[in-house]
Regions:
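Short, glycine/acidic-enriched loop or turn micro-motifs at the edges of active sites
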Residues: 75-77, 136, 229
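Short coil/turn connectors at secondary-structure junctions
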Residues: 6-8, 54-56, 62, 126, ...
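N-terminal metal-binding scaffold of metallo-dependent hydrolase/deaminase domains
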Residues: 1-52
């Protein structure tokens, strides 16, 4: 008998396939053919025909669940470098007494790249194929994602120096930087989607948030923000503006 076309790079056989189709069908003992990094077919198993696919590698998934890649919808991926630094603390204490000080001291393009590559490797190892990120030096993170071949929504991080003293010049600077970032990664296709990330209502003024949100809307880009995370945040925003977040 002849083989079935060009050889496969990988053939996955056995196990149970969770399709995530509208009916959430589960297939028993499927055959999944992969060539050049793409799934080219999914079929019901026919054991006598497996050899016809001539795969370079065969993965026996017996006893396993085969499913589409996981999606991590909220990351600041280089912060893997701060793992274990300060755990189980109230948010504002964690940020102001621990995270913000070490970010000011250690965060640069080199540490962001190292942390991004480590965090991405851990995500891939655990089955995550897409993540949505927001941080400093986001172009460095986007480049690391492209290098690793993982799908990324990359949000350029925006903070005000002092939300009580934001000037029109500072807001114009935010918008120009945002437009430059979106333009740089506009050709990312489905694997790299540029976004804008205002950190939070307690680190970005309403004027900054509105201007950045409008920039995202104008470019058709996602807009990301932390909001209403804790009761303390509600108290902070109520004190500042007389309204909840």
């Amino acid at each position: 008998m002849k083989s079935c076309g060009a050889p496969l790079d990988i053939l996955i056989k056995g196990g149970k396939l969770l399709t995530l189709s509208p009916g959430k069908e589960i297939w028993d003992n499927p055959l999944i053919g992969i060539r050049d990094g793409r799934i080219i077919f999914i079929e019901e198993a026919h054991a006598p025909l497996v050899s016809l696919y001539n795969p370079t590698e065969t993965i026996d998934a017996s006893g396993c669940l085969v499913l589409p890649g996981l999606v991590n919808t909220h990351t600041h991926v280089p912060m893997v470098c701060f793992r274990g630094l300060a755990d189980d603390l109230p948010l504002m204490e964690w940020l102001e007494d621990h995270i913000f000080p070490v970010e000011r001291k250690y965060i640069c393009r080199e540490t962001v790249r190292a942390g991004a590559l480590l965090g991405i490797a851990e995500m891939i190892l655990s089955g995550t194929t897409t993540f949505c990120d927001g941080y400093f030096y986001e172009s460095t993170i986007a480049g690391a994602a492209r290098e690793a071949g993982i799908r990324c929504v990359a949000g350029m991080g925006i903070f005000d120096a002092d939300i009580g003293k934001v000037t029109p010049k500072e807001i114009v600077g935010h918008v120009r930087a945002a437009e430059k970032f979106l333009g740089k990664w506009a050709d990312g296709g489905s694997m790299l989607i540029p976004a804008l990330f205002c950190h939070a209502p307690y680190t970005c003024s309403p004027e900054t948030i509105r201007a950045v949100k409008e920039t995202a809307r104008r470019h058709g880009a996602p807009f990301l923000i932390h909001v209403a995370e804790t009761a303390t945040e509600k108290d902070i925003i109520m004190k500042l503006y007389g309204n909840g977040p």
